[in-house]
């Protein structure tokens, strides 16, 4: 295994270089702006390439030493991609809504996860002794908990690294990571504050193809870390070396 390859052309074809309207920018992003076109800021991909490569190395290194990566993206166009990419790389995710205290009040979150497990046991069994209405209420409670916590139910503690799409929307998650000293890898669009992020990646954080490309690369970097960890322990890598490729990557490579 090796870190995933990517090219400037793939970034261009995924629309990574398109920022927001110029009047919406954060002036702190000035060093990462190439220019503007039709009142849209153009992000300097010559800087994105090395910064993305650095972030991929950090993800791989974190997983290689047994660390956990938490994917965070709750906006509509990121939600499904975030979950799929985290699952494929045996990592964790929050893709519905960030609950305040999700990291800083882990004990309370752990209790909710225990409740989710208990509900699974009850409902996966015969659920004897419950009326139809009681069972329906339990199912609704489980569904609500699973939506909020399903992606972290097996995490076992706070993560060692967080990967975030849309730093403005996920500001609470970033604040909690900072308080706990958890490093953050994040996409920073032209309207973001790069100072908040340990490993920033300048790029569009709205286009589905761009989000799919980032998530695919981060996922494959995590899988590379798993392979390195297993290799160092002498275990057979088995099927983990076979990784499905996101359509965005395939299309970009073929284009």
UniProtKB/Swiss-Prot annotation:
PROSITE patterns given in the database record: RIBOSOMAL_S2_1, RIBOSOMAL_S2_2
SUPFAM superfamilies named in the record: Ribosomal protein S2
Database matches in InterPro entries: Ribosomal_uS2, Ribosomal_uS2_bac/mit/plastid, Ribosomal_uS2_CS, Ribosomal_uS2_flav_dom_sf
GO biological process: translation
GO cellular component annotations of the record: cytosolic small ribosomal subunit
Molecular function via GO: structural constituent of ribosome
Region (Disordered): 230-255
Organism: Rhizobium johnstonii (strain DSM 114642 / LMG 32736 / 3841) (Rhizobium leguminosarum bv. viciae)
Keyword tags: Ribonucleoprotein, Ribosomal protein
Disulphide bonds in the chain: none
Similarity comment text for this entry: Belongs to the universal ribosomal protein uS2 family.
Keyword Ribonucleoprotein: yes
CDD domains: RPS2
Statement: the UniProt record of this protein carries the keyword Coiled coil: no
Alphabetized Pfam families for the sequence: Ribosomal_S2 (PF00318)
Name listed for the protein in its UniProt record: Small ribosomal subunit protein uS2
């Amino acid at each position: 295994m090796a870190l995933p390859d990517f090219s400037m052309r793939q970034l261009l074809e995924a629309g990574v270089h398109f920022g927001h309207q110029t009047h919406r920018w954060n002036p702190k992003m000035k060093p990462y702006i190439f220019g503007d076109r039709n009142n849209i800021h153009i992000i300097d991909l010559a800087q994105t390439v090395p910064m993305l490569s650095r972030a991929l190395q950090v993800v791989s290194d974190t997983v290689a030493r047994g660390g956990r990566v938490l994917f965070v993206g709750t906006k509509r166009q990121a939600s499904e991609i975030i979950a799929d990419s985290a699952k494929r790389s045996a990592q964790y995710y929050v893709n519905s809504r960030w609950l305040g205290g999700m990291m800083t009040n882990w004990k309370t979150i752990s209790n909710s996860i225990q409740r989710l497990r208990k509900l699974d046991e009850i409902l996966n069994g015969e659920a004897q002794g419950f009326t139809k209405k009681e069972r329906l209420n339990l199912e609704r409670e489980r569904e609500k908990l699973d939506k909020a916590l399903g992606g972290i139910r097996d995490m076992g503690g706070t993560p060692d690294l967080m990967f975030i799409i849309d730093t403005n929307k996920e500001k609470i998650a970033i604040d909690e990571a900072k308080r706990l000293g958890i490093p953050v890898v994040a996409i920073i669009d032209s309207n973001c504050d790069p100072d908040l992020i340990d490993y920033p990646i300048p790029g569009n954080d709205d286009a589905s193809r761009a989000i799919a490309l980032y998530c695919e690369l981060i996922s494959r970097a995590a899988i590379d870390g798993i392979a390195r960890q297993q290799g160092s322990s002498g275990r057979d890598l088995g099927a983990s070396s076979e990784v499905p490729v996101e359509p965005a990557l395939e299309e970009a490579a073929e284009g």
